[in-house]
Amino acid sequence: MLICPSMSDDPSKKPKATPAEVPTKGADYSHLEPKIYLLPNLMTAGNLLCGFLAVLSIFKGMHGELELLQGIEGVTHATIHDFYEKAIFFIFGSCIFDLLDGRLARLGGQESPFGREFDSIADVISFGMAPALLVSKAVLFNLPPEIEWLGWVVSFSYLLCGAMRLARFNCLAAMPQDPKGNSDFLGIPIPMAAGFIASLTFLLSNFYEVGKDLGAWNYVLVGVTIGLSILMMSNVRYPSFKKVDWSTKGSFWGIILGTLAIGLIFHETTRSYTPAVIFTLYLIYGLVRPLLSKKLRRSLSETIGG
């Protein structure tokens, strides 16, 4: 069989490089290097640290459960509960750091592709892996053996949808900006999904005696996790809080509500359910916002930036 040589096989027929394409010896390519800004990326590092500590605390709790089954002295339900509660607070800490890194980057004009990618990698650990392990612990260890696989499937589905949600966000962020100035999130953001799981687990752990089986609530956690996985990959729009105008009257009420929420979180009698209420309101708001009047949406937008 004869093989006809292509133009690329004949050196004499190859197109010559133009002067602009010829690499210049000693050329300065520093302008092509990704810009790394210190303060926003320190916040992202704090996010990643909290996620790592959350995963570590969950593993310690799981190890404690095995030691309790083996009858090792010194291990109690209370000590195991403390490990899981620490993991929940570390996830909340990651939410705060994640909020700060974006704010600082925008205020200082320091948004960059590097920061966006670094933030997504940290989010996979803090808001993907840690909540997935928390769900697998809360669900898997209490399900009947014949349907034990359900806990693993639900947990991994959440992690998978969270990672895909972050990948989609990065792709959309790299595209030209919306000419209408729409800054909404497409699908519930993974920090909010993680916060909802952590707050619900925190609520249930305080409603039941330490070491007591959650019973039917196991299946509620399964349904919530599946619902959050679907919402992360949905086209439901959620406010990003990027357009808060501190000079408006609505922002004053936003500050009042935020201060009140912080006070309730730190109050002994309300701290167990306040986070769950906050994350639930955000989740519901995204679902019902299209049904609200334009006037009400505009008023809420001035208050919460959405």
Show the residue positions of the predicted features.
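Topogenic membrane-insertion module of multi-pass membrane proteins
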Residues: 2-99, 278, 289, 295, ...
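C-terminal membrane-associated helical module and adjoining short loops/tails
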Residues: 2-29, 182-306
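Multi-pass membrane catalytic core of lipid/isoprenoid biosynthesis enzymes
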Residues: 42, 78-89, 107-166
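Active-site His/Glu-centered metal-binding helix of metallohydrolases
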Residues: 49, 96, 100, 104, ...
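Membrane-interfacial alpha-helical segments at the cytosolic side of multi-pass membrane proteins
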Residues: 52-60, 128-138, 195-203
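Alpha-helical transmembrane segments of polytopic integral membrane proteins
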Residues: 52-55, 93, 97, 131, ...
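Interfacial loop-to-helix junctions that mark the boundaries of transmembrane helices
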Residues: 72-83, 143-152, 185, 211-220
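C-terminal ends of transmembrane helices
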Residues: 102-113, 163-180, 233-241, 287-292
